[in-house]
C-alpha cells in the first residue's frame, strides 16, 4: 500500500481532468472499480473510499490487473468533489452506500440535497449517474433528492429497468451479502 497508493493518489488542490473520466463513490473492496477500469481502458476512473481496508483491497485488484487508468482518493468524497472541475465527469457510481437506516442518523447519509447539487456541478450534461441500494427507504430518499431541482432525469421506463442489474454491472462482495431490507435496486440517471 505504501508503494502503490502514492502513485495513484489524486493530488491535493484543484483536479485537472483530461479525456473521459468516471467516478466511483465509496468503492468498498474495489471490485467494481477495477472491473470497470479493465473493461474501459480508454476511460480514467477515480475511486473515492475513506476506509483503509477498502483502499488496500482496491490496490490489490489494480496491481493484479496491472491497471494504469485508475486514480484513488483515500478520504471523504466530498473533499474530492469540491476540487473537481465543472462538468469534468461523464459518469458516476454510488453503489450500496451506508444506508444509515435509523431516522436519527439520516443526516449522515451521503445522498443529501447539497451533495446532489455538487454532483450535478461536476457531471457534464448528458453524463450518467448510477445509484444502487438494497434498502427501500434509502432508494426512495435518494430518488426524491436526485429528481428534485430538475438536474437529473431518471431513465427508467419499466420496472425491469431498476429491479435487475444493468448489463454492465459488476456484483460486489457487499452486494452479495444482501444486508438490506429489499432486493437490490438500480437507479440510472442522466444529467440534464
What are these regions (language model features)?
Residues 25, 48:
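Conserved beta-strand/loop positions that form the S-adenosyl-L-methionine
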Residues 51:
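Conserved SAM/SAH-binding beta-strand->alpha-helix loop
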Residues 1-23, 31-40, 59-86:
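S-adenosyl-L-methionine
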Residues 111-125:
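A short glycine-rich, Lys/Arg-flanked "PGG" loop and its adjoining helix->strand segment in the class I
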Residues 144-192:
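Class I S-adenosyl-L-methionine
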Residues 126-133:
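Conserved beta-strand signature within the Rossmann-like core of class I S-adenosyl-L-methionine
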Residues 28:
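Conserved glycine-rich SAM-binding loop
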Amino acid at each position: 500500500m505504501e508503494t502503490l497508493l502514492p502513485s495513484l493518489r489524486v493530488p491535493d488542490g484543484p483536479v485537472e481532468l483530461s479525456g473521459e473520466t468516471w467516478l466511483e463513490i465509496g468503492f468498498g473492496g474495489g471490485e467494481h472499480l477495477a472491473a470497470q477500469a479493465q473493461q474501459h481502458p480508454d476511460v480514467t476512473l477515480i475511486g473515492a473510499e475513506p476506509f483503509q481496508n477498502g483502499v488496500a483491497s482496491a490496490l490489490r485488484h489494480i496491481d493484479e490487473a496491472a491497471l494504469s487508468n485508475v486514480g484513488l482518493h483515500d478520504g471523504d468524497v466530498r473533499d474530492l468533489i469540491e476540487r473537481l472541475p465543472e462538468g469534468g465527469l461523464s459518469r458516476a457510481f454510488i453503489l450500496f452506500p451506508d444506508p444509515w437506516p435509523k431516522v436519527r442518523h439520516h443526516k449522515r447519509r451521503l445522498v443529501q440535497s447539497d451533495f446532489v447539487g455538487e454532483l450535478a456541478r461536476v457531471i457534464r450534461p448528458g453524463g450518467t449517474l448510477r445509484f444502487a441500494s438494497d434498502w427501500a427507504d434509502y432508494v426512495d430518499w435518494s430518488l426524491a433528492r436526485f429528481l428534485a431541482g430538475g438536474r437529473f432525469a431518471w431513465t427508467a421506463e419499466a420496472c425491469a429497468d431498476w429491479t435487475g442489474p444493468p448489463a454492465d454491472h459488476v456484483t460486489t462482495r457487499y452486494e452479495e451479502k444482501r444486508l438490506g431490507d429489499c432486493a437490490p435496486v438500480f437507479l440510472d440517471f442522466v444529467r440534464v
